[in-house]
């Protein structure tokens, strides 16, 4: 990738997700499109364009893929979720601007559990919302603040094999963990540059062992933790050379 609007080029790519075939989907935010690549990085297809119609976007952000390889996209500027098949054909959408149940304000990260329920970081409302696969509202939790279960601009979401929900709480410089019903389990992190500290944690991903990978835009690095938040390792520094980062965002495993 490089900066631009051609196939395989990006302007502010945000999140990525990987389907059952190993293909990589990227939300190319400022080009208002989704791009798809094979495991070797070869361009396969794209869809989108600026607008508010079906299949159009205003700053696509979070991505999630269900067990049928349908693609869920948080359409941040349109305050909605859109769903597509693997080829980019529009299937459905839900959401409207507001703070009521099922309404959204700047939706960001997405996570999908084993039952197909969709978890959304409703960033502007400082909460998480949960929907069934058809977009019907199920539950919500969170409010503005820095206490347990409160948020200051929740960013990315990831769900482990037990259904626990991990959220990067960007403005509070921490990660919070909840069960599937929204009950607070644990949190870790504070503002700083040491091991286990964060400056604006962004992307989250969980591997098959339950280890948690967190990208930080402020420290230009990736940190890895065990499921209980114990620091394991890190890599990255600011730059454009191989292995260096500049405002790292989404991750995929």
Where are these regions (language model features)?
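Eukaryotic scaffold repeat domains enriched in small/polar residues
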Residues: 1-253
